[in-house]
């Protein structure tokens, strides 16, 4: 990269090697047509390592349910529910033109933010937010300064509660014509609400970007991940959130069965927390539990400033709920990739399920 050895602070953290690019939006609208802020399809051109890149994006229209709701709480404890218009959202997935194996997951809300794969390499892109608003940084994850070098792990072990496990994600694939849908509720606990200084717009953007990333990975299993609701515990936690992931998961499952399931139609609920779980654990979920009111849940620690890493942890715990166990030994997710169901989150880019691509 041209800026090797120089560092810059981005939302994703301190990046040491990066390239400044200027994405140019290519419009295909006929002359005189009214341009929407976030069109159904968009195309951007820029250069990476001196080579031209054409990024083709399509709006992720299946991101939200038709009756999507957002919930927060007033200081006196009243639940406040809104149904915002989300059709005009700014979350996209796509590919690089003339690269059949390429993928992209991009937020276009404030410049471009997300990641794309080209010629087997994954790059992240993020707006520099300078007075020159078109300037973006392109970088690899390996060039993000690590906050903590310790390995982070899923808390599911061989003796963790399970019904009938599906050994590999590939066993979930019935046929390419059989599309399935999973409606999920994301609950943001009070520690995470406080971490983002009560900025609900920032929290929503963080969560939506994660779900957009997850939906790309689950697409290869012919499962659409749809957000039914986002609930923020803005005043206080509605359960006892502990450093024990197991205790927190149990409490969250009981709360879902007693409360959440009776007011929001959904298949699965995930708790996002800024609480630092004991040991290396960053997530936990019941295995093969999708149809159980108390057990179709997971808990995920907001453990990184790199959205992609938290998103993959979330995708991992949802897969446990579906009945998928950890991958053992070697994993065929392509050169340079660790599979989503690896029990350890490390410094490699994590993208696919075993044998799903």
Curated annotation (Swiss-Prot):
A Pfam family it matches: Reprolysin
Q: Which GO terms describe its biological process?
A: proteolysis
Catalytic activity, EC: 3.4.24.-
What subcellular compartments does it reside in?
Answer: Secreted
Classify the source by domain of life: Eukaryota
Residues making up the signal peptide according to the UniProt record: 1-6
The free-text tissue note of the record is:
Expressed by the venom gland.
Q: Can you give the propeptide residue ranges?
A: 7-176
- Entry keyword annotation includes Disulfide bond: yes
Q: List the disulfide bonds.
A: 333-339
Q: Name one GO cellular component term.
A: extracellular region
The Peptidase M12B domain is annotated at: 180-357
Q: Top enzyme class of this protein?
A: hydrolase
Which coenzymes or cofactors are required? Zn(2+)
**Catalytic-site annotation from UniProt:** 317
The main location is secreted
In the record, what terms sit under GO molecular function? Answer: metal ion binding; metalloendopeptidase activity; toxin activity
Q: How is the cofactor bound?
A: Binds 1 zinc ion per subunit.
**Binding, Zn(2+):** 316, 320, 326
What PANTHER family does the record tag this protein with?
Answer: ADAM A DISINTEGRIN AND METALLOPROTEASE DOMAIN, DISINTEGRIN AND METALLOPROTEINASE DOMAIN-CONTAINING PROTEIN 28
Per UniProt, subunit arrangement is:
Monomer.
Q: What protein am I looking at?
A: Snake venom metalloproteinase H4
Q: Which organism is it from?
A: Deinagkistrodon acutus (Hundred-pace snake)
